């Protein structure tokens, strides 16, 4: 009998994942991570306490062991540091991607394997497929909130040991199955996108994080593409590419954030049509297969529809040419590649070419 550790969030997805594995005859245990956000001034707050309690209860209902692990050090090192530094440097990061790579499918999965688990499972709706002895993550075309964009940085070496018990399902299916199984989490609401932003406001978080430090965030100028001053901004980290609301600049036509000049502490504003770019480069690349000369499907942000592109690899960077221009491509976000529904890999966008 194979041992499987399920990453338990206390939600319906991971609950049904554990239940399904039990029904398939696996020896199942649950694990939940908690962590503290550590602010430079010494203040901290705990994340995951309620999730851990909910996970403990569902594991008790299922009759399986449950373990809580504290990954404060790892989460602050890999996720919070990257998150704040990117925003302060005019980039827009995606912390869930970094967390999946380094924490959930990093130290958490490794902990499971080191303690005797043969497999590590989560409540994703994607699937793991083996094609010619190469393992891929395959997106679920029925899932309107497909999560594979956030999974492209997982180490390919551990894919053979990952199980997604809910592959091919939809949320409505999951809730129905959970109700049939009388799982106590069947009607629990879905979790928020970014776990350490309870109010969803990253600006407040960064302002608090850098308070009482020697990091100085000063106001500067909004400028157009020619450098003409259009108004004052209140700190570069408050803005992202494509942003229109909250600029406080009156002009003859709508203006959007199109770039940053970090050295001059300037936020560049442009017309909508000037947000469209032709290509990008991406670093910190992770690929599940070698690239070829054919077309790939591309996402430059999570909710985006697929865009066609041509890709080549040069000096450990992805150089991606768009078949048609794409708007609001943003440094710090990820360029994620697909071939059909197969996740091929991706990288962090570091340059955008117009």
Give residue spans per PLM region.
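AMP-forming adenylation/ATP pyrophosphatase catalytic core
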Residues: 121-354
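ATP-dependent adenylation/nucleotidyltransferase module used to activate substrates
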Residues: 1-152, 173
């Amino acid at each position: 009998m194979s041992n499987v550790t399920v990453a338990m969030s206390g939600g319906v997805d991971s609950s049904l994942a554990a239940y399904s594995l039990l029904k398939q005859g696996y020896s199942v245990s649950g694990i939940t991570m908690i962590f503290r956000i550590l602010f430079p001034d010494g203040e901290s707050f705990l994340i995951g306490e309620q999730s851990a309690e909910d996970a403990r209860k569902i594991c008790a209902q299922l009759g399986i062991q449950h373990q809580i692990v504290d990954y404060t050090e790892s989460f602050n090192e890999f996720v919070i540091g990257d998150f704040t530094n990117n925003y302060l440097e005019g980039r827009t990061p995606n912390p869930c991607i970094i967390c999946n790579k380094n924490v959930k499918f990093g130290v958490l999965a490794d902990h499971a394997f080191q303690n005797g688990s043969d497999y590590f499972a989560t409540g994703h709706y994607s699937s793991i497929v083996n094609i010619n002895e190469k393992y891929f993550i395959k997106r679920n075309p029925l899932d309107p909130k497909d999560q594979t964009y956030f999974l492209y940085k997982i180490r390919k070496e551990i894919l053979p040991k990952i199980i997604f018990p809910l592959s091919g399902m939809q949320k409505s299916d999951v809730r129905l199955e959970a109700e049939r199984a009388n799982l106590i989490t069947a009607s629990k609401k879905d979790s928020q996108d970014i776990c350490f932003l309870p109010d969803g406001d990253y600006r407040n978080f960064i302002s608090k994080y850098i308070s009482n430090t020697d990091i100085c965030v000063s106001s500067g100028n909004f400028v157009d593409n020619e450098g003409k001053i259009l108004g004052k901004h209140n700190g570069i980290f408050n803005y992202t590419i494509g942003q229109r609301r909250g600029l406080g600049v009156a002009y003859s036509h709508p203006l959007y954030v199109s770039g940053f000049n970090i050295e001059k502490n300037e936020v560049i504003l442009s017309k909508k049509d000037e947000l469209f770019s032709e290509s990008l480069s991406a670093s910190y690349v992770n690929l599940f297969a070698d690239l070829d000369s054919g077309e790939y499907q591309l996402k430059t942000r999570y909710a985006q529809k697929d865009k066609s592109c041509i890709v080549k690899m040069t000096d450990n960077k992805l150089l991606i040419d768009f078949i048609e221009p794409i708007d609001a491509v943003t440094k710090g976000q990820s360029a994620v590649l697909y071939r059909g529904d197969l996740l091929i890999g991706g990288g962090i966008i570091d340059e955008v070419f117009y």
